[in-house]
């Protein structure tokens, strides 16, 4: 239950950060059937699909990406939307890593991102 609370708190925090940056941000909180993403953020005609993950152990294992998330993010891209992102919170920093980047790393056999990778691939 602690992980769920950490995740929910991070989703709320990220929505507040996005709103402060001028985005309209909506958190798909309290979803019973499991949505494929946590947040949609819109600004200047661009919509961003974001899944927020807390990385308590300084790694983001790709096994945490669910199949329905991959399918939804692929469809999001096919519909000509902006690339979806994973917002990774690690050591009180937030790293925005693009889904296409992660998908490419998975194809190359990578199993996770460590803190060094988050700094390298994140914005």
Task: Label each region the model flagged.
Residues 7-20, 100-123:
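Helix-rich interaction surfaces within compact, conserved domain-sized segments
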Residues 32, 43-45, 90:
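A generic beta-sheet turn/junction motif
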Residues 28, 49-52, 87:
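Short, conserved beta-strand edge motifs with alternating hydrophobic and charged residues
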Residues 74-102:
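Nucleic-acid nuclease catalytic cores
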Residues 39-41, 45-58:
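Conserved catalytic cores of phosphodiester-cleaving nucleases, focusing on short active-site segments
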Residues 1-30, 94:
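Acidic-basic catalytic patches of nuclease active cores, encompassing PD-(D/E)XK
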Residues 55-72:
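Mg2+/Mn2+-dependent nuclease catalytic core
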């Amino acid at each position: 239950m602690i992980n769920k609370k950490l995740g929910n708190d991070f989703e709320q925090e990220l929505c507040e950060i996005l709103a402060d940056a001028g985005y309209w941000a909506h958190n798909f909180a309290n979803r019973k059937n499991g949505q494929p993403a946590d947040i949609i953020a819109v600004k200047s005609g661009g919509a961003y699909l974001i899944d927020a993950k807390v990385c308590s152990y300084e790694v983001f294992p790709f096994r945490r990406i669910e199949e329905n998330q991959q399918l939804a993010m692929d469809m999001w891209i096919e519909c000509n939307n902006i690339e979806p992102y994973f917002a990774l919170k690690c050591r009180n920093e937030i790293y925005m890593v693009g889904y296409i980047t992660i998908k490419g790393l998975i194809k190359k056999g990578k199993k996770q991102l460590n803190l060094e990778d988050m700094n390298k691939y994140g914005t």
